[in-house]
Swiss-Prot record:
It comes from Bos taurus (Bovine). GO terms for molecular function: ATP binding; identical protein binding; metal ion binding; non-membrane spanning protein tyrosine kinase activity; protein kinase A catalytic subunit binding. The architecture of this protein is similar to that of Src-family kinases (SFKs) with one N-terminal SH3 domain, one SH2 domain, and a C-terminal kinase domain. It catalyses: L-tyrosyl-[protein] + ATP = O-phospho-L-tyrosyl-[protein] + ADP + H(+). This is Tyrosine-protein kinase CSK. Residues 9-70 form the SH3 domain.
Length: 450
């Protein structure tokens, strides 16, 4: 290990670059691709004490492993499979053949160094749109500005907004899927040879969720075909590389296969979504202590996101999963972004989303707190859909006039007070997740003494 490299602290995750059989009794053997966790630095900086997935500890050589890093979404061109770099106008037109309306790529501008060009196939022709770079922002029409190319492409994928067509299908750069390099560099790329796909456990709009086996461990695998939605899932995986908490579903790694698509591999949550878990068991099986534990599990995950300046934006019982040992973990980070960013509100679940987020696209930890209040209501109603007997179109007008749902049957008054505190129309008066956790822990302590 180089003398200038700082020692890795305890808890650092590493991925093995080579096989290590060990030469002494205290060594920890491992195979290329294994994930190891640093336990302590040794006196010799070239060696660490580490543990493997099953908790066995031993000494490992530092130069055989690579530290896992968080992938920063939105800053790396390598996460954009439609970006082709320095190619000419003529090369772009050849790549967009045979013609297919909505097929597109982005290249560096040959006429305007520093700018980009969006090339789009439409009605048998290829249109070239200059993307101007000015004052650290990007724009095609000098009306709408974007922080980066990903945001720009995301916008025109959902709306043509003056272009000849909406962007439908990216022309993936030949020979490589750029994201692969980035996940490999940061230690999150897994090998397809080590993954067995067993059975479909869920179907979504963008692909399937499958039960898999990765090196003898059960895993869940999101399988996404390479299309215009792949970028959103790469962004989700990028967010997950930056987050680590016992109540967040853990990313194990990413596989990018040019022909077969994108695979996001996470820990397997045997008991499925919290909403289904609650509905299938109900009041006769689940006691108040169990409901309070699930509430605290989710609250602790959200307190962690709050502390790391992430906003989930889609918190609901359907996006919380339950493990074999009944631990609730927050999942589905598809909309999760750093707290400063905004978002199109077209696809947001109205009944779970804070009024200011629907009205003004103002997302913050406090809008997540509103959603947490709805999730608490779901937990204590054993998975009922919120705002029962109110037509969807009437929910927002009634909420904005101050309407709050009644307490679910049998819900402790103290828990209902927590829900109502989450539903203040003034976001600033809602509690933080730290305060919510403290309130729920006080309720738990009080119940233990009853």
């Amino acid at each position: 290990m180089s003398a200038i490299q700082a020692a890795w602290p305890s808890g650092t995750e590493c991925i093995a670059k080579y096989n290590f059989h060990g030469t002494a009794e205290q060594d920890l053997p491992f195979c290329k691709g294994d994930v190891l966790t640093i336990v302590a630095v040794t006196k010799d900086p070239n060696w660490y004490k580490a543990k493997n997935k099953v908790g066995r500890e031993g000494i490992i050589p530092a130069n055989y492993v690579q530290k896992r890093e968080g992938v920063k979404a939105g800053t790396k061109l390598s996460l954009m499979p439609w970006f082709h770099g320095k190619i000419t106008r003529e090369q772009a037109e050849r790549l967009l053949c045979p013609p297919e309306t909505g097929l597109f790529l982005v290249r560096e501008s040959t006429n305007y160094p520093g700018d980009y060009t969006l090339c789009v196939s439409c009605d048998g022709k290829v249109e070239h749109y200059r993307i101007m770079y000015h004052a650290s922002k990007l724009s095609i029409d000098e009306e709408v500005y974007f922080e980066n190319l990903m945001q720009l492409v995301e916008h025109y994928t959902s709306d043509a907004d003056g272009l000849c067509t909406r962007l439908i299908k990216p022309k993936v750069m030949e020979g490589t899927v750029a994201a692969q390099d980035e996940f490999f560099r940061s230690g999150w790329a897994l090998n397809m040879k080590d993954l067995k796909l067993l059975q479909t456990i869920g179907k979504g709009e963008f692909g399937d969720v499958m039960l898999g086996d990765y090196r003898g461990n059960k895993v869940a695998v999101k399988c996404i075909k390479n299309d215009a939605t792949a970028q959103a899932f790469l962004a989700e995986a990028s967010v997950m590389t930056q987050l680590r908490h016992s109540n967040l579903v853990q990313l194990l790694g990413v596989i990018v296969e040019e022909k077969s698509g994108l695979y996001i591999v996470t820990e397997y949550m045997a008991k499925g979504s919290l909403v289904d878990y609650l509905r299938s068991r109900g009041r006769s099986v689940l006691g108040g202590d169990c409901l309070l534990k699930f509430s605290l599990d989710v609250c602790e995950a959200m307190e962690y996101l709050e502390g790391n300046n992430f906003v989930h934006r889609d918190l609901a019982a359907r996006n919380v999963l339950v493990s074999e040992d009944n631990v609730a973990k927050v999942s589905d980070f598809g909309l999760t972004k750093e707290a400063s960013s905004t978002q199109d509100t077209g696809k947001l679940p109205v009944k779970w989303t804070a009024p200011e987020a629907l009205r003004e696209k103002k997302f913050s930890t406090k809008s997540d707190v509103w959603s947490f209040g709805i999730l608490l209501w779901e937990i204590y109603s054993f998975g009922r859909v919120p705002y029962p007997r109110i037509p969807l179109k009437d929910v927002v007008p009634r909420v904005e006039k101050g309407y709050k749902m009644d307490a679910p049957d049998g819900c402790p008054p103290a828990v209902y007070e927590v829900m109502k505190n989450c539903w203040h129309l003034d976001a600033a008066t809602r509690p933080s997740f730290l305060q919510l956790r403290e309130q729920l822990e006080r309720i738990k302590t009080h119940e233990l003494h009853l």
